[in-house]
Amino acid sequence: MAGNFSEIESQGNISLKFGFLGLGMGGCAIAAECANKETQIKNNKYPYRAILVNTNSQDFNKIEIKNAGNVRKIQLEGYEQGAARNPQVGEEAFVKHETKIFETVKQEFEDRDFIWITCGLGGGTGTGALLKAIEMLYEHDYNFGLLLTLPRDAEALKVLENATSRIRSIAMNQEAFGSIVLIDNAKLYRKFEEENPSALANEYTSYSNKYIADALHEINLVTSSFTPFSDTHFDASEFAQVINTPGVLSLAKLELKSNQLDTENPLGYLTQLGNALEKGVLYDTEREELESAKKSALSIVTSPLRASRLYNFSFLNQMENFLKDRTPYVDERPIAPYVNKHTAKKEEDIVKFYSVVAGLPLPKRVSDIIDEITRIKEEREQANSKKSNAVLNKLFAFDDSVQEEKPKKKKLNFGAEPEAEVADDSQPTKKKLSF
């Protein structure tokens, strides 16, 4: 989704007013990037608000903020050096300043339709504060969901363990709040590497934050910016119902040229659409997971020229059957064909598909992280045991007993004129120690 906006699309209307509560370094960076999203809507250039909560004072200096009026920073005083990847410290810091944080939430998010708690799982501040932030919003009846990044396998063992520990706690209580959007850092990192092979390593963070912000912003535009072609559409109120659905939320997007959409031979483009649905924008979803979804929707956007030719009964029927096949047990699954009357000339031939699927189980990626933790621990134990045994074997083989040396026998001297013995009253030389 990132990088696919046209200037005209940025003039569209947003469906829902989002607030972002950023926790820790990663969460604050994502929240700030979401608040940086611009539109050309009159009196609403920056439609989103963010509150950034962190311990380490230096982290705030790394965050670019385009409109200070839409972003509030809360420094957790007394913890300026950070939480050192210790979630207990992050939780303690949040609890100590919870009153101040909640007062800011009331002030900044009073008119928000939905709040996203953003957090990079695995660290200290964000991971530690996450459960307390959930409790705070839940107890005060806010509509909210979670926007969480999953660590890559290359992260340290402690990071992986911190992340899985929090996911387990969240899973036990996920029916109490709205959707969970998971961002697989491993997936985004591979995408960045493929698209930017010569880029510097430190450019990835900026790329991923913008990618996440664009994905959420674009789907929020689609549901409110274009002209419905038929009586069936997916509006802002339905989008609100979807993101308020407990469980994991998957976003997907596919762009095809109109000549790739042969309604008489639909297998080709339906296969591509199915792959896009499973791959997702932010994390991969398996087909079996999609089948357990609670809600789904598919929006289609194209130019007026293509809409008049494409949106026939046969095509829309194929779309309905496709979504029914992929998400058979959902409560609702609207198919919404839209017309973008402001399509740029170069995009007149493009057809864009957007899907949202809610109420999903935790993805296989979480299981993969647990497997990675198990592998690291087993290999570490084997390595330590092997090294320890090698040292012990040497120690046990080492003979540290000292045998008493016999005095050397005096050489005989039968010379013609033997020298007279001279008494030596000096003390014997002390033997040096050798360890």
Swiss-Prot record:
Keyword tags: Cytoplasm, DNA-binding, GTP-binding, Hydrolase, Nucleotide-binding, Plasmid, Plasmid partition
Cellular component GO terms held in the UniProt record: cell division site; cytoplasm
Keyword DNA-binding: yes
Alphabetized SMART domains for the sequence: Tubulin (SM00864)
Gene disruption phenotype: Loss of plasmid replication.
Catalytic activity: GTP + H2O = GDP + phosphate + H(+)
SUPFAM superfamilies: Tubulin nucleotide-binding domain-like
EC primary class: hydrolase
Protein role: A tubulin-like, filament forming GTPase; the motor component of the type III plasmid partition system which ensures correct segregation of the pXO1 plasmid. Essential for plasmid replication. The filaments seed from a DNA centromere-like site (tubC)-TubR complex which extends to surround the TubZ filaments. Highly dynamic filaments grow at the plus end and depolymerize at the minus end, a process called treadmilling. TubR-tubC complexes track the depolymerizing minus end of the filament, probably pulling plasmid within the cell.
Subunit and interaction comment: Polymerizes to form two-stranded filaments and bundles at higher concentration in the presence of GTP. Binds to the TubR-tubC protein DNA complex.
Protein name in the entry: Tubulin-like protein TubZ
Organism in which the protein naturally occurs: Bacillus anthracis
Phylogenetic classification of the source organism: Bacteria, Bacillati, Bacillota, Bacilli, Bacillales
Gene: tubZ
